[in-house]
Amino acid sequence: MMRPGLARLLLLCCLLLPAAAQAQAQPQAADEYAAKAAFIYNIAQFSTLPNMNGVVRLCVLGRDPFGSALATLEGKPLGNARLSIVYPHSGPEALMQCHILYISASESDDMTALADSARAAGVLTIADTRGAARKGVMLELVLDDRRIAFEFNGAAARGAGVVLSSKVLRLARAIY
């Protein structure tokens, strides 16, 4: 005869085993973009952005690679403001509602034009497409030995009036 405590423990293990196996089977990309979402939020905490008025709008332009990772950030505080996630239609006029713009890889053909339009509007731009910082995007997220790193385009940030903390800039893998 099995003791009740041991029986409950065995039942709990049987119930959790499939969930643990499923978590192991999830694509690595989901973990990567969850980490990138957290990274973007942390960068935003150490950024001074023009035109903030109680809400900081993080826009995702193009195909959304984040899945549900960004939804967990909705409403989180950024100084005296709250973070709002927006999915604008394409085009430079859509950028006017953004404070931070993530440019998806699906928009890589238009990356330079989008970065230029966003800079003119005072919007912090972020992408994880290779070479994005050299095309005018302010922060290029890079996967470096399974860690998120970034390259920073200082000229683009200055042109937009975006200021990143020197503490953040010390972590940059490269500064242009």
Task: Indicate residue ranges for each PLM-predicted region.
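Short hydrophobic alpha-helices and adjacent helix-cap/hinge residues
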Residues: 2-8, 12, 21-176
